[in-house]
Amino acid sequence: MSTVPAKGPLTPQQLSLINRYWRAANYLSVGQIYLMKNPLLREPLQPEHIKPRLLGHWGTTPGLNFIYAHLNRIIQQRNANVIYICGPGHGGPGMVANTYLEGTYSEIYPAISEDEAGMERLFRQFSFPGGIPSHAAPETPGSIHEGGELGYALVHAYGAAFDNPDLVVACVVGDGEAETGALATSWHSNKFLNPARDGAVLPILHLNGYKIANPTVLARLSDDDLDNLFRGYGYEPFFVEGSEPADMHQKMAATLDTIFQRIQDIKKNADVHSPERPRWPMIILRSPKGWTGPKTVDGLVVENYWRAHQVPVANCRENDAHRKILEDWMKSYDPSDLFDEKGALKPELRALAPKGEARIGANPHANGGLLRKELHMPDFRQYAVNVTEPGAIEAQSTKILGDFLRDVMKLNETEKNFRIFGPDETASNRLGSVLEATNRVWMAETLDMDDHLAADGRVMEVLSEHLCQGWLEGYLLSGRHGFFSCYEAFIHIIDSMFNQHAKWLQVARELEWRKPISSLNYLLTSHVWRQDHNGFSHQDPGFVDLVANKSADIARVYFPPDANTLLWVGDHCLKTWNRVNVIVAGKQPEPQWLTMAEAEKHCEAGLGIWEWAGTEDGLEPDIVMACAGDVPTMETLAAVDLLRQSLPHLRIRVVNVVDLMVLQSPHQHPHGISDEEFDRMFTTNRPVIFAYHGYPYLIHRLVYKRTNHSNFHVRGFIEQGTTTTPFDMTVLNELDRFHLAMEAVERLPLGESVAKPLIDNFTEKLALHKDYIRQHGEDMPEIRDWKWTWPR
């Protein structure tokens, strides 16, 4: 167990100054939670000085302020490059207070000036209508992590540290957050951090003992158990424990001196080509919850107990005794010793804060758009599949994309600003070509038989979707680019992380000072229609439904039907910013439909009429066969083949959709097509049989305001699955060619004499299919060997 000597490095004057600075941050934090007037307590507190609704979290805040003050000291002392990730983001008052003290806040928000009037506005705006949120939200300078939903602080910290060799990411992990699954696995991120090319992450485990109303698990472990636990993870824990401020300041200062020297030594001694995994230092900080706040309220323990978690003194407007407790509490910080007559922080305290971009709140790594550089991109057309006739050849679309991504990796090797992420699926998802340009990063033990593992790899693989998502978010938020491929069904593991990132982007877009960051790009493959071998557990296309719920300024969903369209979409997504792009594409051999020139035109429009597949010949169609997704596209064309053979005079229009959001009105989504264009594509009164990759209701939801919505008949995944054959997956969900053809026949005014024999024939085919697969274990030859044979 590592501790520092009892005698600390601070002189009496330094100790007094840093304690006063901490008191100032605590004072401002309490003021934000409680006050809307009288910010410097120049008169006795009155009910009208108190906010009518008291919102915020005090318990974690003094510890966060303590850490911030000491990071300021080490930044000044060592000219260190530090950002601060606040895992307990509900301690937002502290993060706002500290950026105000250092001057960053007033530079960004001039109305919150460094005087009494500005302080009043600072207090009033917190958790107040028209003001700012209660957490370390995008509005907070220096934050890349809101910390509302807990679990992602440490993984964001590592993401920010990758490829930032001069950066130290101080990451506070609350002991409540430490109980989450995502955080628990994040400790293993040190096996992927290369000291020769990456920055350092300094985890600070803040053990204040309690969550909202319960003790925390780690806080009830002995120091020996904690030391053994984190040494097992590969860290060297340093303990800073106590409640007496002077003693704690000395301990923290000495500990940070030791740790930053340790980090410097680790990086100095790291071998660029084959660095060994070091034992990175971390801090375990034991301090009271609600430190320096009221010890009791109404005879009940508050400080160092869960009652300090949110608002320790709850009824300050109506209850005179409570208001007196608050006033005494705030006066205990002695504001006249901290702020001058105008309400500005006294100069000797302001001198403790770093200057310029060295300030935590002004560090450009926490406003990654300032550092973002465009990727050097190959010409995606060079990877085109040579399509002479629609459906004449097959290819693995994601394998073609892998070749493209390999060269994106090569072209950006010098910049070192592009990584690929995946939960042990890069090769499985047919992106293995990228390993021709780089390796999988790996700092743990390696064996002679290991393949493509290296300390300097740029493919991040670990069997945790949480880590892949979190690393990528941290990497993007600090100004870089990335690409995340995942099995479609298991991307649901990070549904909530996606939610939080999308919310962050939505707010950040409205802040002029936050510059755009690279988009979060997903490739969802090994998808529902080709998970016949793994079964029902692997069959779920619902992630896109979640994405479609998000702001239209953020969400994009693409269903490229073949390799050439996938190349266009992949290239496009890597060039965008402030978006979440979801690409759904299969990895198995599939028919290739469009030439590259056709693919470009099709993708730029987002959807299009495939005239070569239809029979309308410039006339109004009798029926529209629409599709979105590679397998639905193939089944739609196979259904069209059946209809063309059975009903040669039928006028069929085939519409393929790549960009799902074009289906919405332009009033709902910026990619939406006009009502006039929609009606031109889908008609105003003809039946539309829409074969969709996912759950059918999403298409109905997107088009419900369109003229012809009542004639849309959508087929997709209806939660029927098992281990079976590929074609049987479509049959189980009635998305196959026979069901699509029957739906078309039933919707057309053909008369029973024409319709019934066709339906009987298609029904018989389905019965034959069922018998055949149960006897032979594979699809019928006419299904396996089907090809589109109609000439252009």
Curated annotation (Swiss-Prot):
Keyword Protein biosynthesis: no
UniProt cross-references to Pfam families, sorted A to Z: XFP, XFP_C, XFP_N
GO molecular function, one term: aldehyde-lyase activity
Keyword match DNA repair: no
Annotated Gene3D superfamilies: 3.40.50.920, 3.40.50.970
Recorded superkingdom: Bacteria
Names of the cofactor(s): thiamine diphosphate
InterPro entries the UniProt entry points to: Phosphoketolase, THDP-binding, Transketo_C/PFOR_II, Xul5P/Fru6P_PKetolase, Xul5P/Fru6P_PKetolase_C, Xul5P/Fru6P_PKetolase_CS, Xul5P/Fru6P_PKetolase_N, Xul5P/Fru6P_PKetolase_ThDP_BS
SUPFAM superfamilies named among the record's database cross-references: Thiamin diphosphate-binding fold (THDP-binding)
Coiled-coil parts of chain: none
UniProt cross-references to PROSITE patterns, sorted A to Z: PHOSPHOKETOLASE_1, PHOSPHOKETOLASE_2
EC top class, as a word: lyase
An example Gene Ontology biological process: carbohydrate metabolic process
Residue stretches spanning the membrane: none
Keywords: Lyase, Thiamine pyrophosphate
EC numbers: 4.1.2.-
Record family assignment: Belongs to the XFP family.
HAMAP family from the UniProt entry: Phosphoketolase
Protein name: Probable phosphoketolase
Species this protein is from: Brucella melitensis biotype 1 (strain ATCC 23456 / CCUG 17765 / NCTC 10094 / 16M)
Taxonomic placement: Bacteria, Pseudomonadati, Pseudomonadota, Alphaproteobacteria, Hyphomicrobiales
